[in-house]
Amino acid sequence: MAAKDVKFGRTAREKMLRGVDILADAVKVTLGPKGRNVVIDKSFGAPRITKDGVSVAKEVELEDKFENMGAQMLREVASKTNDTAGDGTTTATVLGQAIVQEGAKAVAAGMNPMDLKRGIDLAVNEVVAELLKKAKKINTSEEVAQVGTISANGEAEIGKMIAEAMQKVGNEGVITVEEAKTAETELEVVEGMQFDRGYLSPYFVTNPEKMVADLEDAYILLHEKKLSNLQALLPVLEAVVQTSKPLLIIAEDVEGEALATLVVNKLRGGLKIAAVKAPGFGDRRKAMLEDIAILTGGQVISEDLGIKLESVTLDMLGRAKKVSISKENTTIVDGAGQKAEIDARVGQIKQQIEETTSDYDREKLQERLAKLAGGVAVIRVGGATEVEVKEKKDRVDDALNATRAAVEEGIVAGGGTALLRASTKITAKGVNADQEAGINIVRRAIQAPARQITTNAGEEASVIVGKILENTSETFGYNTANGEYGDLISLGIVDPVKVVRTALQNAASVAGLLITTEAMIAELPKKDAAPAGMPGGMGGMGGMDF
């Protein structure tokens, strides 16, 4: 086992604080509408330019192992906030640094670190309760757009696009962000449930120009096994022909005699029909077929359930207003499923998302959830250069996460103002002087984001913070973008409560651990052995021409 270097007390804390400061100073320049960019060198390709706090934090790796430990713990604040709320990573880093700096001073002055931490926790809980009490629910599309705009660093076009996407696919719908091939940023919405399986034969096409099969007011047969035998299918086909409605067959595969007969019937015009393979594989295929069944109000024909294909009746089939099938995708719009059943299924999938530990499973469950909840929207981010597209995509991702958080828990005045106001409302009392000091640390630290935003804009933070606190209105604050004071909510300068709350809780949690650290252990750097000399016996090589 390699030898270790151990540092104690003040020496350890100073090293750790240095690491915290290096990381936080690199991240906090990006905060606010007038925040600056950070350029990150990449081992291949062009450097990356970003204003995304967590992207900057993830790149900071320090040479000194003790400093690096401090930086890594603060990085954890940004990552955790990003995972939970999707935005607010810079705010969390600024808060973390402020609490650690104040706490380190108090510990150096001889206060008990454990009591300080208890005081910090008391104050943070009170601030969180205050924020949730002040939260304003958002209802209109304009309010969603405002949140998106603020999070995208003031780009109104992005805010508007996110609001439009949310309106189309609902708050639960999936909105993905991709890099566009063009310079334009655009929004594409797929309504209904779409899965990546196309028609099994081009003969099913009803619109030869677009090469798609459109079925209006169709019946849907869901079968989990292969269909190759025509006899078993005949009763269903005859029942559907009587209704003169189209039929879509979704099965593991349709082949041989069954497929040939379906194609011949389609070509003769006796039966409007199309067949596609079921989406997914294995257990996931079963689950997705069940999703389609619930969405369309049908049943999955499965031998596990004791249902034979020959005994299928019309009421076991799903229904949908419209089905559109291309070479690659099938889209089912307006299924006839019961809302209560769909909601129950959505709840079940949400439960699975919470319980799963695999990122891959979580992603697949999110996709299923979106398809059930009403659609998928894709925002394609364009730009003149690759570097610009990547930077813009970071901002769109942040804005999207912030708007989701805002819809979930509501909004408060932005620009760090909500925390600034909360600092004057802390009434918690500690049981001793050290806990009181912990409460005061939070009082001072939660002013840091507002101060940093104004500092980044080149303004005098103390003057502006003083002026905001003089006014008694909860929503009065400073608009850094144009240098004016006013009612921030009506100006559209808002922050999602979930983002502010998560940032503060994570910052306090990690800062509390840093303050209470008394020893640090790291591996000693290995001493390099002296390079070996040239081996002997290489003489006598004269006269050789190289």
Curated annotation (Swiss-Prot):
Its EC number is 5.6.1.7. Pfam families: Cpn60_TCP1. GO terms for cellular component: cytoplasm. Coiled coil: none annotated. The keyword Ribonucleoprotein does not apply. It is found in: Cytoplasm. ATP binds at T30, L31, G32, P33, K51, D87, G88, T89, T90, T91, G415, D495. Together with its co-chaperonin GroES, plays an essential role in assisting protein folding. The GroEL-GroES system forms a nano-cage that allows encapsulation of the non-native substrate proteins and provides a physical environment optimized to promote and accelerate protein folding. PANTHER family: 60 KDA HEAT SHOCK PROTEIN, MITOCHONDRIAL. This is Chaperonin GroEL. It comes from Brucella canis (strain ATCC 23365 / NCTC 10854 / RM-666).
